[in-house]
Amino acid sequence: MVTFGYGVEATGYAGIKPASFLQLQRINNIGGITITPATIDASALEDSVTKTVAGRGETGGTWTVTVNFTSETKTEWANLISAYQTAKASGLNMWFETIVPGFEDAFFVVAQPPEAIPMPEIAQNGLLTVEFPLVIVDVKGMSAKVAFT
């Protein structure tokens, strides 16, 4: 099963992957992140056809995680938001880890959660879910996974 969680950088270790991560429960969907390079016009006046080169990569800015919204997950995400606010005040980042079975490494992303729990989508005879838009700070990619606590 795929597992997902977060960790906060330790004091004195800003920019370093946290040594511990807390697992979040009832995750329904973890959005993908595609880094799309911007194109830069590298044409000269004598060129009859535009020449482009790859520029800085663009992540799209946000990354959505959908959660089955229960009293337990509400508490988990309230604690996450509080942990982020404490970390931010100390100049530290929050990292998110996605562990996929069969891989030795996990996916890591540095991101900022919303300041409050968003209103969930409510549908007739539907599962109560909430989408958390995480602002992408840095896509770290895959590296050695850290076991969840």
What annotation goes with each model-predicted range?
Residues M1-F69, Q112-L127:
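Solvent-exposed edge beta-strands and adjacent loop segments
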Residues G5, G91, I136-D138:
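Short, flexible coil/linker elements and helix-boundary hinge sites characteristic
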Residues I33, E97-S143:
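Short beta-strand and beta-hairpin "edge-sheet" elements
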